A protein has these predicted regions:
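Long, Pro/Ser/Thr-rich low-complexity/intrinsically disordered regulatory tracts in eukaryotic proteins
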Residues: 1-158, 173, 187, 191-194, ...
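Conserved phosphate/anionic-ligand binding catalytic regions in large, soluble enzymes, centered on
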Residues: 160-177
């Protein structure tokens, strides 16, 4: 494991399309390995096996994306280092609940991260500056294909990709954009958009909590399971 250095977020240091409103675009994939229990039901040996399997695939992930990756074992980090990763939204607080055999794989520009053994065996997250879902989507699918070339992924012909949380069942995909919306907050119009968003299959939430801090909001899809 490399020595910890504070990750520099490439999507924050460059300007993308519609950057005056759209700060970043994100795609996340949830995946699990076949015939292994979800992390919340797995024992120490299961979690250690999953961690080692994914570490071995880093060269394949690098080849698929053209990026250089490092990995961090969460239980080997100091409390401060762990909090830096949380504050930069590179890991979830839940990953710290029981850090043993938990892993973060991240590209050197931090545009791609993979949490290992959080809710699911794999949480692949890809970011891009501005309004650009195509770039992170292509990276996420490339990583997904690279992993599936070596490991069997939990998949059901009717239900799709199997996930720990039913809300991710199906595609396991969440696409979101990070928006700066001060005018809607000041004119008190945001609540109207929030109220109709479920009708569009979308969810809107404040990026920093409940008090509209920074007037920054995340909009993502609610539906991951297909229907006829």
């Amino acid at each position: 494991m490399p020595k910890f250095t504070t990750p520099q977020l490439s999507w924050l240091t460059t300007l993308g399309k519609e950057a005056d409103i759209v700060l970043a675009s994100r795609v996340r994939l949830a995946r699990n390995l076949k015939n292994l229990p979800f992390p919340n039901r797995a024992n120490i040996n299961d979690l250690a096996q999953i961690k080692e399997l994914i570490i071995r695939l880093i060269p394949a992930i690098e080849s698929a994306t053209g990026l250089k990756f490092d990995y961090l074992e969460i239980d080997k980090l100091t409390h401060l280092e762990q909090q830096v990763l949380v504050e930069k939204h590179l890991i979830s607080k839940k990953l710290l609940t029981n850090p043993e055999n938990r892993l973060l794989i991240l590209s050197q520009d931090a545009s791609v991260t993979i949490m290992v053994n959080e809710d699911d065996h794999l949480r692949i997250q890809c970011m891009a500056s501005g309004l650009d879902l195509n770039t992170p989507l292509a990276k996420a699918f490339a990583i997904d294909d690279a992993i599936e070339a070596y490991l069997n992924i939990a998949f059901d012909e009717k239900m799709g990709y199997l996930t720990a949380c039913p809300t991710n069942l199906g595609t396991g995909l969440r696409a979101s954009v990070l928006l700066h919306l001060p005018a809607l907050v000041m004119t008190q119009q945001l609540s109207k958009i929030v109220n109709i968003s479920p009708q569009l299959g979308l969810a809107i939430r404040n990026f920093f909590g409940e008090d509209n801090a920074g007037n920054i909001f995340q909009i993502d899809n609610q539906l991951t399971l297909g229907f006829k």
